[in-house]
Amino acid sequence: MYGLYHTFNFITSYDHKDPSEKSIAWRLIVLESLAGVPGFVAAGYRHFHSLRTLQRDHGWIATLLEEAENERMHLIVCLEVAKASTLTRSMVIAVQMVMTPALFFLYIFHPKSMHRFVGYLEETACYTYVNVIRNIETPGTKLHTAWAHLPAPALAIGYWRLPADASWKDTLGCIMADETHHRYSYSYSSLKLFVNFVFVSAMSTIRSPI
Protein backbone atom coordinates (compact mmCIF):
# COMPACT_ATOMS: atom_id res chain seq x y z
CA MET A 1 0.00 0.00 0.00
CA TYR A 2 2.92 2.34 0.75
CA GLY A 3 4.25 1.80 -2.78
CA LEU A 4 0.83 2.38 -4.36
CA TYR A 5 0.37 5.59 -2.37
CA HIS A 6 3.65 7.13 -3.48
CA THR A 7 3.15 5.96 -7.07
CA PHE A 8 -0.25 7.64 -7.07
CA ASN A 9 1.34 10.81 -5.67
CA PHE A 10 3.87 10.81 -8.50
CA ILE A 11 1.26 10.22 -11.22
CA THR A 12 -0.99 13.03 -9.95
CA SER A 13 1.94 15.43 -9.30
CA TYR A 14 0.87 15.70 -5.66
CA ASP A 15 2.90 18.12 -3.53
CA HIS A 16 1.90 17.56 0.09
CA LYS A 17 3.21 20.95 1.28
CA ASP A 18 1.62 23.22 -1.32
CA PRO A 19 -0.39 21.33 -3.96
CA SER A 20 -1.76 23.14 -6.98
CA GLU A 21 -5.44 23.36 -7.85
CA LYS A 22 -4.89 21.33 -11.03
CA SER A 23 -3.03 18.49 -9.27
CA ILE A 24 -5.67 18.20 -6.54
CA ALA A 25 -8.55 18.34 -9.01
CA TRP A 26 -6.98 15.50 -11.00
CA ARG A 27 -6.21 13.55 -7.84
CA LEU A 28 -9.77 13.82 -6.51
CA ILE A 29 -11.34 12.76 -9.81
CA VAL A 30 -9.10 9.70 -10.13
CA LEU A 31 -9.37 8.81 -6.44
CA GLU A 32 -13.16 9.00 -6.28
CA SER A 33 -13.65 7.22 -9.61
CA LEU A 34 -11.74 4.25 -8.20
CA ALA A 35 -13.15 4.40 -4.68
CA GLY A 36 -16.61 3.56 -5.95
CA VAL A 37 -15.49 0.26 -7.46
CA PRO A 38 -14.73 -2.06 -4.47
CA GLY A 39 -18.09 -1.68 -2.72
CA PHE A 40 -20.03 -2.35 -5.93
CA VAL A 41 -17.85 -5.37 -6.80
CA ALA A 42 -18.27 -6.86 -3.32
CA ALA A 43 -22.02 -6.19 -3.32
CA GLY A 44 -22.32 -7.79 -6.77
CA TYR A 45 -20.48 -10.91 -5.67
CA ARG A 46 -22.58 -11.20 -2.51
CA HIS A 47 -25.76 -10.72 -4.57
CA PHE A 48 -24.84 -13.68 -6.78
CA HIS A 49 -23.78 -15.69 -3.71
CA SER A 50 -27.19 -15.09 -2.13
CA LEU A 51 -28.96 -16.21 -5.32
CA ARG A 52 -26.68 -19.21 -5.78
CA THR A 53 -26.95 -20.50 -2.22
CA LEU A 54 -30.63 -19.56 -1.80
CA GLN A 55 -29.79 -17.75 1.43
CA ARG A 56 -30.21 -14.28 2.91
CA ASP A 57 -27.28 -11.88 2.89
CA HIS A 58 -28.25 -10.17 6.16
CA GLY A 59 -27.59 -6.57 5.19
CA TRP A 60 -24.13 -6.71 3.61
CA ILE A 61 -25.32 -5.97 0.05
CA ALA A 62 -27.23 -2.82 1.01
CA THR A 63 -24.35 -1.54 3.14
CA LEU A 64 -21.73 -2.04 0.41
CA LEU A 65 -23.96 -0.54 -2.30
CA GLU A 66 -24.58 2.53 -0.13
CA GLU A 67 -20.83 3.00 0.21
CA ALA A 68 -20.31 2.67 -3.55
CA GLU A 69 -23.12 5.13 -4.30
CA ASN A 70 -21.71 7.63 -1.81
CA GLU A 71 -18.30 7.44 -3.47
CA ARG A 72 -19.93 7.98 -6.87
CA MET A 73 -21.61 11.11 -5.52
CA HIS A 74 -18.22 12.37 -4.33
CA LEU A 75 -16.99 12.06 -7.91
CA ILE A 76 -20.02 13.80 -9.41
CA VAL A 77 -19.69 16.68 -6.93
CA CYS A 78 -15.96 17.05 -7.64
CA LEU A 79 -16.75 17.23 -11.36
CA GLU A 80 -18.88 20.31 -10.62
CA VAL A 81 -15.63 22.13 -9.79
CA ALA A 82 -12.95 20.24 -11.72
CA LYS A 83 -13.17 19.22 -15.36
CA ALA A 84 -11.80 15.86 -16.48
CA SER A 85 -9.47 15.95 -19.47
CA THR A 86 -9.39 13.31 -22.19
CA LEU A 87 -6.25 11.87 -20.58
CA THR A 88 -7.98 11.62 -17.21
CA ARG A 89 -11.03 9.91 -18.70
CA SER A 90 -8.81 7.43 -20.56
CA MET A 91 -6.85 6.69 -17.39
CA VAL A 92 -10.03 6.10 -15.37
CA ILE A 93 -11.38 3.68 -18.00
CA ALA A 94 -8.10 1.76 -18.23
CA VAL A 95 -7.66 1.43 -14.47
CA GLN A 96 -11.31 0.45 -13.97
CA MET A 97 -11.01 -2.31 -16.58
CA VAL A 98 -8.08 -3.79 -14.67
CA MET A 99 -9.27 -3.05 -11.14
CA THR A 100 -12.80 -4.46 -11.43
CA PRO A 101 -11.95 -8.08 -12.40
CA ALA A 102 -8.92 -8.06 -10.07
CA LEU A 103 -11.05 -7.09 -7.07
CA PHE A 104 -13.78 -9.54 -8.08
CA PHE A 105 -11.37 -12.48 -8.05
CA LEU A 106 -9.77 -11.23 -4.85
CA TYR A 107 -13.20 -11.20 -3.21
CA ILE A 108 -13.85 -14.75 -4.38
CA PHE A 109 -10.66 -16.17 -2.90
CA HIS A 110 -9.92 -13.85 0.03
CA PRO A 111 -12.67 -11.31 0.75
CA LYS A 112 -11.10 -10.18 4.02
CA SER A 113 -8.04 -8.94 2.12
CA MET A 114 -10.23 -6.77 -0.07
CA HIS A 115 -11.97 -5.20 2.92
CA ARG A 116 -8.58 -4.57 4.51
CA PHE A 117 -7.31 -2.98 1.27
CA VAL A 118 -10.35 -0.70 1.10
CA GLY A 119 -9.75 0.32 4.71
CA TYR A 120 -6.22 1.44 3.82
CA LEU A 121 -7.53 3.20 0.71
CA GLU A 122 -10.07 5.17 2.72
CA GLU A 123 -7.46 6.04 5.35
CA THR A 124 -5.30 7.49 2.57
CA ALA A 125 -8.28 9.48 1.28
CA CYS A 126 -8.79 10.95 4.75
CA TYR A 127 -5.18 12.16 4.82
CA THR A 128 -5.63 13.74 1.39
CA TYR A 129 -8.77 15.66 2.34
CA VAL A 130 -7.33 16.83 5.66
CA ASN A 131 -4.31 18.21 3.83
CA VAL A 132 -6.42 19.86 1.13
CA ILE A 133 -8.63 21.60 3.71
CA ARG A 134 -5.58 22.68 5.70
CA ASN A 135 -4.07 24.25 2.58
CA ILE A 136 -7.31 26.05 1.73
CA GLU A 137 -7.30 27.56 5.22
CA THR A 138 -3.65 28.66 4.96
CA PRO A 139 -3.16 32.10 3.34
CA GLY A 140 -0.49 32.18 0.66
CA THR A 141 -0.98 28.62 -0.59
CA LYS A 142 -2.13 27.81 -4.11
CA LEU A 143 -5.33 26.19 -2.86
CA HIS A 144 -6.17 29.17 -0.64
CA THR A 145 -5.90 31.45 -3.66
CA ALA A 146 -8.03 29.17 -5.85
CA TRP A 147 -10.63 27.75 -3.46
CA ALA A 148 -10.85 29.82 -0.26
CA HIS A 149 -13.87 31.79 -1.49
CA LEU A 150 -15.32 29.23 -3.90
CA PRO A 151 -19.02 28.51 -3.19
CA ALA A 152 -20.32 24.97 -2.78
CA PRO A 153 -22.01 23.48 -5.87
CA ALA A 154 -25.80 23.35 -5.70
CA LEU A 155 -25.58 19.55 -5.99
CA ALA A 156 -23.45 19.38 -2.83
CA ILE A 157 -25.79 21.71 -0.94
CA GLY A 158 -28.72 19.45 -1.76
CA TYR A 159 -26.93 16.15 -1.11
CA TRP A 160 -25.46 17.06 2.30
CA ARG A 161 -28.19 19.57 3.21
CA LEU A 162 -25.70 22.39 3.57
CA PRO A 163 -26.70 26.03 4.11
CA ALA A 164 -27.18 28.11 0.97
CA ASP A 165 -23.98 30.08 1.63
CA ALA A 166 -21.79 26.97 2.10
CA SER A 167 -18.31 27.00 0.59
CA TRP A 168 -16.33 24.45 -1.40
CA LYS A 169 -14.25 23.91 1.73
CA ASP A 170 -17.44 22.92 3.59
CA THR A 171 -18.17 20.44 0.81
CA LEU A 172 -14.71 18.90 1.13
CA GLY A 173 -15.29 18.63 4.88
CA CYS A 174 -18.45 16.60 4.21
CA ILE A 175 -16.59 14.33 1.80
CA MET A 176 -13.84 13.83 4.38
CA ALA A 177 -16.47 12.89 6.99
CA ASP A 178 -17.86 10.27 4.60
CA GLU A 179 -14.37 8.86 4.02
CA THR A 180 -13.81 8.72 7.77
CA HIS A 181 -16.92 6.55 8.00
CA HIS A 182 -15.86 4.34 5.09
CA ARG A 183 -12.45 3.60 6.57
CA TYR A 184 -14.22 1.31 9.04
CA SER A 185 -14.16 -1.19 6.21
CA TYR A 186 -11.15 -2.36 8.23
CA SER A 187 -13.61 -3.89 10.68
CA TYR A 188 -15.41 -5.88 7.97
CA SER A 189 -12.27 -7.98 7.52
CA SER A 190 -12.57 -9.08 11.16
CA LEU A 191 -16.16 -10.30 10.79
CA LYS A 192 -17.46 -13.64 9.59
CA LEU A 193 -18.40 -12.63 6.08
CA PHE A 194 -21.36 -14.92 5.42
CA VAL A 195 -23.32 -14.70 8.66
CA ASN A 196 -25.59 -12.03 10.16
CA PHE A 197 -24.15 -8.57 9.63
CA VAL A 198 -23.52 -6.76 12.89
CA PHE A 199 -25.62 -3.76 11.78
CA VAL A 200 -28.64 -5.99 11.16
CA SER A 201 -28.29 -7.62 14.59
CA ALA A 202 -28.38 -4.16 16.17
CA MET A 203 -31.48 -3.23 14.16
CA SER A 204 -33.42 -6.42 14.84
CA THR A 205 -36.42 -4.51 16.19
CA ILE A 206 -37.06 -2.70 12.91
CA ARG A 207 -37.27 -3.75 9.30
CA SER A 208 -33.78 -4.21 7.87
CA PRO A 209 -32.23 -5.37 4.57
CA ILE A 210 -32.22 -9.11 3.97
Model-assigned labels for residue ranges:
Residues 1-210:
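Non-heme di-metal
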